[in-house]
Amino acid sequence: MQNLLELKGISRRVSDRFSLRDVTLAVEPGQIVGFVGANGAGKTTTIRAALGLIKLDAGEVHLLGQRCDANAPDETQRHLRSRIGFVLDTCPFPSTLKVGQIETLVGPAYPTWDRKTFAGFINRFGLDAKTKVKDLSRGMGMKLQLACALSHNAKLLVLDEATAGLDPMAREELLDELLAFVADGQHSVLLS
């Protein structure tokens, strides 16, 4: 069975020091893979590399068995990245948009976006479509990101410190969603 994500010897240098050095990681279908480290150890940089948000100095990123880094064709990168859902440590959506408007921003980026699924998660997570993003608590902002991440048939979820700062109930609810996501053995989660 092919890995959903594979990082092969990735390195990233900032100024004269490494922020990542020779990182290798594989995420198989059905796994929840977490990695920990001290502040500044490179967790967020690793996630940004997996998402293709930074240029690497060395190594390769493979998604769904195909190379997906700066050396892969743009169309291949777009297609493969559309199969990833992500949750960042802070809510990235424009603060003036309402929860119900986020779909118009995110949906077009994913060919497999499902409006009905998104509406279902908004309802299930107790989000009010009329609430502005700036008025969401940290936990509700995470739920909004998770609703987006789960609404386009992603094979892999990548979460950057998604449980940091969440209250115990919100953390447990998030972890329950992740367990449900991988239950079929075909989907995976990478989280820091």
Feature locations, PLM:
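Catalytic Walker B motif of ABC-type/P-loop ATPase nucleotide-binding domains
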Residues: 157-161, 166
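Helix-to-loop junction immediately C-terminal to a conserved catalytic motif
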Residues: 51
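Conserved ABC transporter NBD signature motif
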Residues: 59-72, 79-80
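ABC-family P-loop ATPase nucleotide-binding domains
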Residues: 78, 82, 86-145
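Helix N-cap at the start of a conserved alpha-helix in ABC-type nucleotide-binding domains
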Residues: 41, 168-170
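Helical segment within the ABC ATPase nucleotide-binding domain
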Residues: 171-185
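The feature captures the beta-strand-to-loop junction immediately N-terminal to the Walker
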Residues: 36-38
